[in-house]
Amino acid sequence: MPAAALQRRPWVPAASEDHVLSIAADAAARDAASVAVEIERLVAENHRIHDVDGLNLNPATNVMNPAAEALLSRGLGSRPSLGYPGDKYEMGLEAIERIEVVAAELAAEVFGAKFAEVRVSSGALSNLYVFMATCRPGDTIIVPPPSIGGHVTHHAAGAAGLYGLKPVSAPVDADGYTVDVAALAKLAGEVKPKLITIGGSLNLFPHPVPAIREIADGVGAKLLFDAAHLSGMVAGKAWPQPLEQGAHAITMSTYKSLGGPAGGLIVSNDAALMERIDAIAYPGLTANSDAGRTAALARSLLDWKVHGVAYAAAMRETAQALARALDARGLPVFVKARGFTQSHQLAVEAARWGGGQHAAKKIAQGGLLACGIGLPIAPVEGDINGLRLGVPEIVRLGFTPDDMPQLADWIARALEGDAASVAAEVRERRTHLGELRYIVR
C-alpha cells in the first residue's frame, strides 16, 4: 500500500495531525477512480451536514443565491485577467472585464462608496491591503481586542503582525461591546498610531465611528472599519454607514452576512488611499483574480441592491427575537440590560457549559452549528467564554421572529443533553423549508 506523501508537522497539535495523516493515508491507498468517488462522497456529506441535517447559526457563513453560486462553475475562474479594463495584458477578456466593472459598480452603489476593489481573495487580505496602504513595518496601530471580537488579522499573529506592525489593543466599553472612547483618545495620544481599526467577529451595537474618526484625525491616523461580519447589515442600511460616519475604508468578507462567494472586498471614498490599494492589488499581491468569484459577487450584490433593506431588517428582528427567547428559557444572553443586540448576531455567556466551544459542540450534536467567541467577562479556563450565534442563513431559509421560541427551545435542550431528539426535530423542520428569501431570481 503506497505511503502518504504528507509528513508529520511537529508544530501542529498532535491530535489534529494524527487526523490529517489518517486522511492522507486513506487517500494515498486509493486509485484515481476511488479518490474521485470519495471526493464526491465528501461533497455530498457536507451537503447533508449543512443543508439536510443542520441549521447554521454561525454568522460567519451563509447560503448563496443559487444563480450566483452557479457562476462559480461557468469557466471564468481559470481565465487570468491582468490589468485595467480596456487595456488587459491577455487577449479575449472583453466579457470578463465588463463583469469586473459591474461588480465594482454594484459594490459602490450598495455601500455608498466612490471606489471599490473587488479582486481581493479574502477578508484577511483586504485588511492586509489597507495595512500596507496606510502603514509601514514598525508602525503602531490600535485595534479591538479579542474580548470585543477583535479579529486575529488585526493582531500580532495575523496580517498586521506578519507585516511588521505593532498592534495595541484598544480599551474596552464592556457593556457596549465596543471601545471606550475617552480611554481610546488617551491611548492614541500616547502611542501615536498610523491606523485605528474598529469592527470584529461579533458586533452587537453600533460602534462610535464619528468619535473614533475625530481621535484618528487628532493623531494623523487613518480609520479602518472591518465589516467582515457587518457587511450585510451595512449593505441593507440596518446599521450606521461607516463611510458616511468617517471611516477612510471598509474591508469585508463577502460570504458571511453578505451571502456571496468566498472572498474579500474593499470600499472607500478616499481617492489617494484607494490609489495605493489599487497598486497593491495590481501589479502587487492580487495580479490574477478569480473572475468566476467576481461574477458571483456581482450577482450576490444585486440581491442587496433589490432586497437588502428587507433582508437586513429581518436579520436584526430575528436576532433580537432569538435573544429574548433564549433569555426566557433562562440562558445567560450577554448584555441583557442593553437589549442584547442591534445586529444579526448575539452571544451567550458560556461558563455554565465549560466555555463557548464546549457549548458549540453540545448543540452541534443537535444539528445546530455555531462556535465560541470572546466576551469582556470572566475567562473560562481552557476555552472561550462566549457562544456566538447568528441568523443570516436561517433568515434566508425563511425563519422569522415567530420561529425563535422553537429555536431557543432546541438550543436549550441541546445544551441540557437532549441533543438526539433535537437533531430529529431540526431534520424534520428542514424538510418543510421552501425557496430562499431575499434573492433576485
Swiss-Prot record:
GO terms for molecular function: glycine hydroxymethyltransferase activity; lyase activity; pyridoxal phosphate binding. Gene3D superfamilies: Aspartate Aminotransferase, domain 1, Type I PLP-dependent aspartate aminotransferase-like (Major domain). It comes from Variovorax paradoxus. It holds the Pfam family SHMT. Keywords: Lyase, Pyridoxal phosphate. Coiled coil: none annotated. Its cofactor is pyridoxal 5'-phosphate. This is Alpha-methylserine aldolase. Catalyzes the reversible interconversion of alpha-methyl-L-serine to L-alanine and formaldehyde. It catalyses: 2-methyl-L-serine = formaldehyde + L-alanine. Its EC number is 4.1.2.-. Homodimer. The modification N6-(pyridoxal phosphate)lysine is found at K256. Belongs to the SHMT family. Alpha-methylserine aldolase subfamily. One of its GO terms (biological process) is glycine biosynthetic process from serine. One of its GO terms (cellular component) is cytoplasm. InterPro entries: PyrdxlP-dep_Trfase, PyrdxlP-dep_Trfase_major, PyrdxlP-dep_Trfase_small, Ser_HO-MeTrfase, Ser_HO-MeTrfase-like, SHMT-like_dom. The gene is msald.
